[in-house]
């Protein structure tokens, strides 16, 4: 067996134990993990400092360095996230439906774990803990394969988590890390059908497309966010300016950040200078259509066709003036990724049409796309934002990491 197959078998065996562990046992393991992360914070930060130094030396973009970085505040947030997951209701064993048939059979559906989950993700060490916590609470074993840029941080976190599991009486192998960060190991994980029940990629478009194209393990597609904010002619322009500023600049590297601003022609001459005044405080680069450049000037870079389909993950915003509602919705249908879309308007009927006609996991009226997040939706930490329609859509919390099985009670019925 290969190293990865050995890990897969160990995870499968550990998962059988975890699947029938009670809520109290799982919560005790999560609390042990939270305390262990706090106690071994210096060890984790030292590992992260090595990752950060290597990333900067390699010329990693600042927005990506921000994703990689850990500090005491971020670790405190990670620990709080683990405790929030522990406090959430346990979905395992919940009876979704129960009916009595005419022949006396009592047939119900009960939530059960998916089994063993593989997660492939980029240089975001917080994902290591968020994913492990969610998988543990939902009764799933997990095999983690993070980006090489965060390898030392991920290894430190997983060592802490495995020790915490053991101290709480659960198998260490409920959480495993693929230590080989080569492309070959990623390909092997994508095809580990004997041991993995589902594969979840978290990262940019390139990573997700590679997994979808090459995996034989079933995939839940997450992440790519070409998100739009559409300023309707009926918008409160001050509100709209605040929303696009937040949606673009509060954390541009994440998948729920806005990448494209659409503005009705009727309000563009008034709105675009207001928006630009706010956006320039964060040195946002605008890439605009000809009408945008006619209003704001030549310092706006001409938008190329590819810009309308790009998740920039940086302080870059594509801007297009549209003739009205229909063009805006058609544009989103052509260029959006089904993640998060927002309209700013005081027009009730326009808002309702937008909610009805825009096909995305999260559709907003008068709010920033940045709220598409497990914590903000009351789910606790999320494993990712699913942009597909099968199995799960939107922030994937505990329930989205379960399946169901039918349970049937009889009194001797035969057919």
What is the meaning of each model-derived region?
Residues 2, 123-126, 130-141, 156, ...:
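ALDH superfamily catalytic-core signature
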Residues 87, 96-238:
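Rossmann-like NAD(P) dinucleotide-binding subdomain of oxidoreductase/dehydrogenase enzymes
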Residues 14-20, 261-263, 314-323, 338-343:
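Short, well-ordered beta-strand elements within core beta-sheets of diverse protein domains
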Residues 274, 325, 330-415:
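C-terminal core of ALDH-fold dehydrogenases
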Residues 1-107:
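N-terminal Rossmann-like NAD(P)+-binding subdomain of aldehyde/semialdehyde dehydrogenases
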Residues 21-27, 92, 168-175, 251-257, ...:
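Flexible, glycine/charged-enriched surface loops at secondary-structure junctions
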Residues 230-234, 261-265, 321-322, 344-346, ...:
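Short beta-strand-to-turn element immediately C-terminal to the catalytic PLP-Schiff-base lysine
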């Amino acid at each position: 067996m290969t190293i990865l197959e050995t890990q897969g078998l160990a995870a499968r065996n550990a998962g059988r134990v975890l699947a029938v562990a009670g809520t109290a046992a799982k919560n005790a393991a999560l609390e042990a993990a939270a305390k262990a992360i706090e106690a071994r914070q210096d060890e984790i930060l030292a590992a992260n400092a090595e990752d950060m130094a290597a990333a900067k030396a390699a010329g990693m973009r600042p927005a990506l360095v921000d994703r990689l970085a850990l500090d005491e505040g971020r670790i405190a947030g990670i620990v709080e996230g683990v405790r929030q997951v522990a406090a959430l209701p346990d979905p395992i064993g919940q009876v979704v439906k129960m009916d009595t048939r005419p022949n006396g059979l009592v047939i119900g559906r009960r939530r059960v774990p998916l089994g063993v989950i593989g997660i492939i993700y980029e240089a975001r060490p917080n994902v290591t803990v968020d994913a492990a916590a969610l998988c543990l609470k939902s009764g799933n074993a997990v095999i983690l394969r993070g980006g090489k840029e965060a390898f030392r941080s991920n290894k430190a976190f997983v060592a802490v988590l495995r020790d915490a599991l053991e101290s709480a009486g659960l198998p260490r192998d409920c959480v495993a890390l693929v230590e080989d960060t080569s492309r070959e190991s990623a390909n092997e994980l994508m095809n580990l059908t004997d041991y993995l029940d589902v594969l979840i990629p978290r990262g940019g478009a390139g990573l997700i497309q590679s997994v979808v194209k090459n995996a034989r393990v079933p995939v839940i597609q997450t992440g790519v966010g070409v998100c739009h904010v559409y300023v309707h002619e009926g918008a409160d322009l001050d509100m709209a300016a605040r929303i696009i500023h937040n949606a673009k600049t509060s954390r541009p590297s994440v998948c729920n950040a806005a990448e494209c601003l659409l503005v009705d022609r009727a309000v563009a001459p008034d709105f675009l200078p207001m928006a630009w005044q706010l956006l320039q405080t964060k040195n946002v680069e605008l890439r605009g259509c000809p009408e945008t450049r006619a209003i704001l000037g030549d310092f706006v870079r001409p938008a190329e066709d590819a810009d309308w389909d790009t998740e920039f993950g940086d302080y870059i915003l594509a801007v297009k003036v549209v003739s009205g509602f229909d063009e805006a919705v058609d544009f989103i249908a052509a260029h959006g990724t089904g993640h998060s879309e927002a309209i700013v308007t005081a027009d009730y009927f326009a808002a309702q049409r937008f909610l009805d006609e825009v096909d995305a996991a999260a559709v907003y009226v008068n709010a920033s796309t940045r709220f598409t997040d497990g914590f903000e939706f009351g789910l606790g930490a999320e494993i990712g934002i699913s942009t597909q329609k099968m199995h799960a859509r939107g922030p994937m919390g505990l329930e989205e990491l379960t399946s169901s099985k039918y349970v049937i009670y009889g009194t001797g019925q035969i057919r």
